[in-house]
């Protein structure tokens, strides 16, 4: 795991920058970058829970906060640069960046074609995808990266997401 979390932007840099040996030409017609995520959790803390947290609770959550922030930052940059049919809403201010494409191209094709497939690991999304209810504990267990016991359920979720286009929550 790196701070990139979603390594797509790093891969684009390796493929195109002069310091690396590949020197691919930029352009939506030249580069198709497909990124497949592993699922992600939502940070939804209600005020009562937050006010009851101690420093140790907060410290244990910092790695996930940093990884999610890095992933969303990379996602925003790639959507900003690209022709992207799988745009995700980044936040309430910038949305999905569909109207903010960086290019001088009058056709607005972008500097690459980028696709991001991922899904929220939350009870409503999982119910829709798997046609069964998940408790808060079950969802928490799925999200916990070090919980090897979840690997079989995560595999089933991944298969179902692939069959459904992995666009359960993309906008």
Region locations from a protein language model:
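Glycine-rich loops and low-complexity Gly/Arg-rich segments
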Residues: 19-22, 57-61, 141-146
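Short coil/turn segments at secondary-structure boundaries
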Residues: 6-9, 45-49, 129-130
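Hydrophobic alpha-helical segments
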Residues: 5-8, 56, 60, 155
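Active-site gating loop/helix substructures
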Residues: 1-17
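Hydrophobic, mid-to-C-terminal alpha-helical segments
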Residues: 12-53
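Short, low-complexity, polybasic intrinsically disordered segments
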Residues: 45-71
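C-terminal helical/tail subdomains of lipid-metabolizing enzymes
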Residues: 3, 24, 28, 38, ...
């Amino acid at each position: 795991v790196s701070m990139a979390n979603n390594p797509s932007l790093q891969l684009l840099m390796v493929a195109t920058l002069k310091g690396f040996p590949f020197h691919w030409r930029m352009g939506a017609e030249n580069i198709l970058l497909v990124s497949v995520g592993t699922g992600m959790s939502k940070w939804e803390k209600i005020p009562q829970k937050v006010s009851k947290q101690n420093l140790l609770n907060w410290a244990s959550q910092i790695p996930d906060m940093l990884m999610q922030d890095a992933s969303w930052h990379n996602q925003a940059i790639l959507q900003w640069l690209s022709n992207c049919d799988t745009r995700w809403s980044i936040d309430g201010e910038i949305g999905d960046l569909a109207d903010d494409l960086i290019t001088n191209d009058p056709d607005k094709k972008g500097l690459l074609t980028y696709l991001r497939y991922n899904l929220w690991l939350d009870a409503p999304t999982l119910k829709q995808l798997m046609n069964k209810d998940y408790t808060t504990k079950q969802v928490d267990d799925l999200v916990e990266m070090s919980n090897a016991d979840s690997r079989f359920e995560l595999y089933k979720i991944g298969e179902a997401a692939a069959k459904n286009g992995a666009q359960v929550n993309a906008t």
